[in-house]
Amino acid sequence: MRSVDRPDAGARPGVQLVLATWVSVICFWAWNLVGPLSTQYAIQMSLSANQQALMVATPILVGALGRIVTGLMTDRFGGRTMFIGVSLASIVPVLVVGYAAQIGSYPMMVVAGFFLGVAGTVFAIGIPFANNWFAPERRGFATGLFGMGMAGTAASAFFTPRFAKSFGLFTTHAIVAVALAATALLCAAVLRNGPRFLPNTASVLPKLKAAAKLRVTWQMSILYALVFGGFVAFCNYLPIYTKTIYDFSQVGAGERTAAFALAAVLARLLGGILADHIVPKYVVLAALAGVAAQTLIAVFRPPADLWTGLTFIPLAVALGIGTGGVFAWVSRRAPAGSIGSVTGIVAAIGGLGGYFPPLVMGATYDPVHNNYTVALVLLVATAVLLFGYTAIFLPAREPSPLPSSPRSAR
């Protein structure tokens, strides 16, 4: 039995990267199906703010923790097998979420949303996959382009409410399920592992322990928890935020969330490119400063629409540049045979960074004054602390990439 797909040096790197990015778009769309319709569900199911926040946050949790497993499995089986597997595994949860929405069952929605998180693990596959196709000096661009798969979040925010209005809740989810199946077939036909891919057949636990012992793993995890976690949290909670603070319709909130997500996605590519030409530390520092400044402005609830746009779009750009810069940093510093393992941990912590903010926002919302001041101030403080940590403790000159241990390179 063949457990690993052989690398194919004849395939074109650009085609492989674009297809991998497409897989990410569809999986991110599936992963973010709940958020854009959350205000409708809150009315339909008579949910409290905390119940609504839990419903939105649950897929994020599994999408975060599952990245550790998919990262490890990608080191062993390669990106092709894992992309196909995650696409297929996401189909049933998507359909069950649609059915739960159709019948108005909150318990079923939360349980199905838990398994929907599988779609969010796709990110831990794409980073090592891209690294296996591109030389180190091009990996910032490659990981940045793959990161544009986060556009699936924008697509979900923009199209999901419209599809639900035109076709109904279950049919909307069925459309995404069909897209996942078609994507899996396309991967089977076209996608190949890169020529640098060597299966890491070491036992899972030693690989995970080895990655966890690397200082770079935790340095990058802390940073990614803020920038990617902030992106995920805002993209999932912004429909609720804009409806609550500005009383936008579900479609209007979706349009603004889509603009936020798209700005972050485009900025992620910019962050990766900048990190290829500038020391990544400075890219990340600029991003953290932008996050702190723009979130502080948001505390004062600028009026819609011009001033909110001038607040949240630059915030999205800062988060996007930060995500691109951090992962370009990871791809340069992680050991070659453990990139998937390190990526899995970093991506998991980043996802967890997106899990807690919706819960915090739901718990700290002030209905008397109609604001989320406490949650936003906490984000400002965290960004400032990480700016200081990065500026003082992380060196501007990067150490050379660490060699893989003999055991992990087997």
Could you tell me what each predicted segment is?
Residues 76-87, 276-288:
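Cytoplasmic membrane-interface "Motif A"-like loop-to-helix N-cap segments
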Residues 145-191:
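Helix-loop-helix hairpin linking two adjacent transmembrane segments in secondary transporters
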Residues 278-326:
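C-terminal transmembrane helical hairpin of 12-TM major facilitator-type secondary transporters
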Residues 112-149:
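Cytoplasmic helix-loop-helix junction between adjacent transmembrane helices
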Residues 65-103:
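Conserved MFS/SLC helix-loop-helix module at the cytosolic interface between two early adjacent transmembrane helices
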Residues 34-38, 216-269:
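Extracytoplasmic gate region of multi-pass secondary transporters
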Residues 333-369:
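A late C-terminal transmembrane helix in Major Facilitator Superfamily
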